[in-house]
């Protein structure tokens, strides 16, 4: 059935800016597919956002962004802003709700969950990050018990950070890539890559440490959010041959990463998913990641990459040394399980679940059953 769906993106920055990380990536990839399938799709986003495709409407909203939840303390209080873009985005959604069959927020914002019962149109929530702030977790818990059919996560590992959620019964949406846009590269250069926002919780210094030990060139790509953190990495590891490419479009990023022997994922927090992981795999680049969070469900240890203990630089270094033992074709095969079509299928099931509800959560057992929590 064709649906009219209104999405609300992250309020931290415009679509296309890189500030919203994986939330942006997912919406930019997903909404054109849903529109081509005949759904009427729109997005509420901060002003300055790009349009994912001509058939996806974007409501542009002015306002001040909220603080980053990714760097918050657990006891951070909830503060509403009179000129806040988050507040104005949900105000707009309430004004236009009669034009839509479902409203889907991709967020980790207290206000979004609080407002759920005040809408006439069903509101679904895709929790965008792992448990971070106590007050936000509490409102999620309250609304989850009231509206259990209205919640989804990115991965089982993310769901497991919330003690009131059963990872095996909560729908995990994962992510998706347009495989046609990713060319397999069997013969990369002897370089390593790292792709994420330049921010302390992403653990860039660990990639610097490995590059210095092995004297390998390091390609770094991502939004520069914390210049002081970047400067500190440079100062601590002055001998690293590092190239900072900035925040790149999909095609340029792909050319950089597929030309490296491995991509490192070294987050110092629980990564909810990791779109860059499946993007790297799609080009045949194995991923070496810490064995926690979303990447632990995406990387097949010893097949499409390696999983190592979190913050274990020795293990990370040894995994890079062994990377040429892997068949890069297996990385591409793993990425094929995360096609955009399957991603859109999961979203369509979730949207129907939000509208009608069901005794059973429509999980993707082929992906979720491999997680240790299930």
Model-derived regions, located:
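Catalytic cores of nucleotide-sugar-dependent glycosyltransferases that transfer UDP/GDP/TDP-activated
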Residues: 1-374
């Amino acid at each position: 059935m064709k649906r009219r769906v209104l999405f609300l993106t992250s309020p931290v920055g415009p679509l296309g800016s890189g500030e919203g990380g994986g939330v942006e990536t997912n919406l930019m990839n997903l909404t054109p597919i849903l529109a081509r399938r005949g759904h009427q799709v729109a997005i509420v986003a901060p002003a300055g956002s790009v349009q994912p495709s001509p058939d996806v409407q974007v409501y542009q909203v002015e306002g001040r962004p909220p603080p980053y939840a990714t760097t918050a303390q657990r006891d951070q209080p909830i503060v509403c802003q009179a000129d806040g873009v988050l507040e104005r985005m949900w105000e707009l959604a309430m004004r236009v709700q009669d034009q839509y069959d479902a409203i889907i927020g991709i967020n980790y914002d207290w206000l979004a969950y609080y407002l759920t019962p005040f809408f006439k149109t069903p509101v679904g929530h895709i929790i965008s990050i792992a448990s971070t702030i106590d007050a936000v977790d509490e409102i999620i818990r309250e609304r989850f018990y009231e509206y259990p059919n209205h919640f989804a996560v990115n991965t089982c590992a993310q769901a497991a950070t919330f003690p009131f959620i059963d990872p095996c019964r909560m729908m995990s949406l994962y992510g998706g890539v347009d495989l046609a846009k990713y060319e397999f590269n069997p013969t990369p250069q002897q370089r390593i890559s790292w792709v994420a926002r330049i921010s302390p919780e992403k653990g860039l210094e660990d990639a610097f440490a490995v590059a210095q030990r092995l004297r390998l060139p390091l390609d770094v790509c991502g939004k520069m959010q914390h210049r002081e953190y970047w400067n500190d990495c440079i100062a601590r590891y002055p001998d690293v041959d590092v190239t900072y490419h900035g925040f790149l479009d999909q095609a340029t990023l792909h050319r950089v990463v597929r030309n490296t022997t491995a991509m490192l994922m070294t987050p110092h927090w629980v990564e909810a998913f990791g779109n860059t992981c499946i993007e790297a795999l799609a080009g045949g680049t194995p991923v070496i990641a810490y064995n926690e969070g979303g990447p632990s469900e995406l990387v097949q240890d010893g097949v499409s990459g390696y999983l190592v203990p979190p913050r274990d630089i020795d293990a990370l270094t040894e995994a890079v040394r062994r990377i040429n033992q892997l068949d890069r074709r297996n990385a591409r095969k793993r990425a094929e399980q995360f096609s955009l079509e399957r991603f859109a299928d999961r979203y369509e099931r979730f949207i129907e679940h939000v509208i009608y509800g069901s005794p059973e959560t429509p999980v993707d057992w082929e992906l979720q059953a491999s997680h240790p929590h299930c």
